[in-house]
Amino acid sequence: MSTDKTNQSWGGRFSEPVDAFVARFTASVTFDQRLYRHDIMGSIAHATMLAKVGVLTDAERDSIIDGLKTIQGEIEAGSFDWRVDLEDVHMNIEARLTDRIGITGKKLHTGRSRNDQVATDIRLWLRDEIDLILGEITRLQKGLLELAEREAESIMPGFTHLQTAQPVTFGHHMLAWFEMLSRDYERLVDCRKRTNRMPLGSAALAGTTYPIDRELTCQLLGFEAVGGNSLDSVSDRDFAIEFCAAASVAMMHLSRFSEELVLWTSAQFQFIDLPDRFCTGSSIMPQKKNPDVPELVRGKSGRVFGALMGLLTLMKGQPLAYNKDNQEDKEPLFDAADTLRDSLRAFADMIPAIKPKHAIMREAALRGFSTATDLADYLVRRGLPFRDCHEIVGHAVKYGVETGKDLAEMSLEELRKFSDQIEQDVFAVLTLEGSVNARNHIGGTAPAQVRAAVARGQALLASR
């Protein structure tokens, strides 16, 4: 079974119609139709430019623009008939335009190829997606700042190797994620700059013989600059790869954060409680409250990593210029953007609602000799070399393990077995508050520094 070749914009050179399966196999309209708004935006700018340089009359321009706006309305109303035999979003819209306004619709593609058209559409779409994602990052960061300020003095154990290390404040811990997200934001802003270059006017690969005004089209579409080489403009997708790389780093951060939330909500930790609206239950175990949102975000990170590898693999063997391989760029790019945006939205909604369990976190911080480093630092201030202090405290910890006592639970007499430099004032050092308050410098966990970091973060968000 074959399709009617007259449906194809390029059918003139062919002596038989395309096989029906091949038509379906090579079509992209089932997924690239989401570019319709940006495709129409680009076409309106292109028609405006063609009229300005005399390729179209003003009447033809107006007819094309009115027709395109009507088609956009049909698409958004759900009445547009997407046809697989017309291959893609571009030809579906152009065919419908010609149906509506007649032969003038066939003039729209003058001086343009689908190669530069789709490259323009994707860049316009990705530019908007990045803006939405940046907004979600900012919203999540705002929630983190609110939580950090609220919990500036709440003490929890800090971990290395998932073993108790030193006491930190819950607010300080939340600010670590704020910092990572700030870098994610910066990476996406940088990616947007390189995305915001206009391919339109490059035509198939060598440019066009028509007297086009690319600067005008660039201005109309809000691009920062036109692409400087037509071959490069139509063929490369490094901007999409860069986005997926930045998205992968952001999803890696969210995945790590998710892992902590999953641990902290478990019966073994019980550090926090998540509201019921962010959890689900079990079909068999009545007691279960599962942290599905962070678990899914952790799992979805793999989709974005896969999109990055897919695009790198897609591009690695292509000669210049455009190749049909590039049709495969959209689905991984779309999925990466959707996944990152939705994951950020879920976190931005969930994080401000976290309820730390202060007593449990504090009790956990009291276990595991979390103030051992503070005792070593105390001895350093008494004039001993740090390595000797490390050895002394190691012996004290060993004694504590054997007797079941934390350092703060030992008597002065017991502590002095390990160093006669230890005096009564050591017990102020060994408290959780003494430990966190002592780290009172930029980037430290002291409550005063947490509040200062929150203020800096609020100023950063206000400057965006």
Curated annotation (Swiss-Prot):
The gene is argH. The keyword ATP-binding does not apply. It is found in: Cytoplasm. This is Argininosuccinate lyase. It is an enzyme of class 4 (lyase). Its EC number is 4.3.2.1. InterPro entries: Arg_succ_lyase_C, Argininosuccinate_lyase, Fumarase/histidase_N, Fumarate_lyase_CS, Fumarate_lyase_fam, Fumarate_lyase_N, L-Aspartase-like. Pathway: Amino-acid biosynthesis; L-arginine biosynthesis; L-arginine from L-ornithine and carbamoyl phosphate: step 3/3. It comes from Pseudomonas fluorescens (strain ATCC BAA-477 / NRRL B-23932 / Pf-5). GO terms for biological process: arginine biosynthetic process via ornithine; L-arginine biosynthetic process. The keyword Cytoplasm applies. Its main location: cytoplasm. Pfam families: ASL_C2, Lyase_1. It comes from the Bacteria. Belongs to the lyase 1 family. Argininosuccinate lyase subfamily. It catalyses: 2-(N(omega)-L-arginino)succinate = fumarate + L-arginine. GO terms for molecular function: argininosuccinate lyase activity.
